[in-house]
């Protein structure tokens, strides 16, 4: 390649190749061969695999109805948040398999997976779900136990005498 001898030649070459950094990435619909969108969600130690397809609003978790799997109303509410906020309560069927962690972590993992799968199916919902904080992975995990301590931060009882 020929060497550029002056700054004017260099600027002419760099201006010719126009790089627009302000263009937002275009999100396209991601579907599998059966017309479903798939996403994984994580929370604490729980990992959820979530599939979304057009349907009547039925939610299945580990081959059980989600009302049967999650007995506590708070966990059901957490699970349904992204669908309710996106106003798609009765439009999609959700099938999820979740493993690891407790029920609270599993509900959070499914919520994260549903949010991601919704954005794959309908990219226009991304801004709404992003503002609600549903697409962000909650990175809080249990702090490890340290040696010389009873728990992560709790010390053994101290006696002066």
Swiss-Prot record:
MF annotations from Gene Ontology: RNA binding; structural constituent of ribosome
SUPFAM superfamilies, sorted: Ribosomal protein S5 domain 2-like
Entry's Gene Ontology cellular component terms: cytosolic small ribosomal subunit
Keyword Ribonucleoprotein in record: yes
One Pfam family linked to the record: Ribosomal_S9
GO biological process: translation
Gene3D superfamilies for the chain: 3.30.230.10
Record keywords: Ribonucleoprotein, Ribosomal protein
Keyword DNA repair: no
PANTHER family (UniProt xref): RIBOSOMAL PROTEIN S9, SMALL RIBOSOMAL SUBUNIT PROTEIN US9M
Similarity annotation: Belongs to the universal ribosomal protein uS9 family.
NCBIfam families, A to Z: PRK00132.1
Protein name: Small ribosomal subunit protein uS9
Originating species: Bartonella bacilliformis (strain ATCC 35685 / KC583 / Herrer 020/F12,63)
């Amino acid at each position: 390649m020929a060497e550029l001898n002056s700054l004017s030649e260099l600027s002419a070459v760099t201006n010719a190749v126009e790089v627009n950094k302000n263009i937002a990435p275009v999100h396209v619909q991601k579907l599998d061969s059966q017309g479903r969108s798939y996403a994984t969600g994580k929370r604490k130690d729980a990992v959820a695999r979530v599939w979304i397809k057009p349907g009547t609003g039925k939610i299945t978790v580990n081959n059980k109805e989600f009302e049967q799997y999650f007995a506590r109303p708070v966990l059901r509410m957490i699970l349904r948040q992204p669908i309710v906020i996106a106003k798609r309560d009765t439009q999609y069927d959700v099938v999820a398999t979740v493993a690891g962690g407790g029920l609270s972590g599993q509900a959070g993992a499914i919520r994260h997976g549903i949010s991601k799968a919704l954005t794959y199916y309908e990219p226009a919902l991304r801004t709404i779900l992003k503002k609600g904080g549903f697409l962000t992975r909650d990175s809080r995990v249990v702090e490890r136990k340290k040696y010389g301590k009873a728990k992560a931060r709790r010390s053994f009882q101290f006696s002066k005498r």
